[in-house]
Every structure is written in C-alpha cells, then in structure tokens.
Amino acid sequence: VPKFQEFNDWEQMKWNEVQIDILRELNQFKDSFGKDWFKEWTLPDLKYRLKNNWSFYLVEGGWCFIDWNRKYPYLCNRYVFPEHRNKGLGSDLVWLRCNEIVEGGYNTAMIKLEDWNTPALSVMKENIFTKMD
C-alpha cells in the first residue's frame, strides 16, 4: 500500500499544504467525459464529508473515501490520476480501505461499480468482491 494520509476530521487537515495540493490537482483535471472535476468535487464537499463520518485517503496520484454512515461501510469515490493508472495504485486504494474496514471491526463492505467505468471494474479481479444484481 502506498504512503497515504488519512483524514477523519476536518480540523485534522493541514490547510496550507493539503488545500493547495488538492486545488492544483482539481483545477487541472477533467473527468472521462471532459467535464471539469472541480465542478463535481469541491473542498466544501470534503469538509461536509469529514464532519459527517467519512474517511478521506490522499496519496500521490489519487484519493478515495469511506462512508461509515451505512449498515456496511461504503467504498466510494476512488480516483487515480491518468499518469498513475495501470500501475497498481487503484488496487492499492481498494486494499487500503479494505484493511481499514477490517481494523474497524467489519468483515463486509459495499462498493458500487458502474458498467461503463472499465478502470474501476478492474477491482473485480481481486476476488474479494461478490457481484450483486
């Protein structure tokens, strides 16, 4: 698993450092459909999530969340920047969160994968998920 920073609390963030990094990445990025990511995901959104029982993991080249508010923790919003894809970082982000969930006393989690999102579907190769229809 790559070196990561875990944030469970809004006050925990080092804003001079983290905010600049996140803004730099978001301002440059467009999603798979060419839309500006900054319009989809913002710092106020991050602040809301951290104040409402989510965990945020920031690594060089990507990030991911866990939403702890459901019956089973929900692995959501995993993102790997294009230059870091196909190098195992996406799988590392899945395993990082699975380890956190087990450490939190759970043995089940949920993840939603859209059929169109081919890169995200690659986690099914890990043989740790069961497809539900």
Please name every model-derived segment.
Residues P2-W41:
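Short amphipathic alpha-helix that is part of the acyltransferase structural core
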Residues Q19, E25-N27, S55-L58, C64, ...:
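Polar/charged side chains located within well-ordered beta-strands of beta-rich proteins
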Residues G34-F81:
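A conserved beta-strand-loop-helix scaffold within acyl/acetyltransferase catalytic domains
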Residues R78-N86, L113-E114:
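A short, internal acetyl-CoA/4′-phosphopantetheine-binding micro-motif in the GNAT/acyltransferase core
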Residues H84, G88-L96:
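Conserved acetyl-CoA pyrophosphate-binding loop and the N-cap/start of the following alpha-helix
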Residues S91, D115-D133:
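Conserved active-site alpha-helix within GNAT-family acetyltransferase domains
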Residues I101-L113:
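Conserved GNAT acetyl-CoA-binding A-motif
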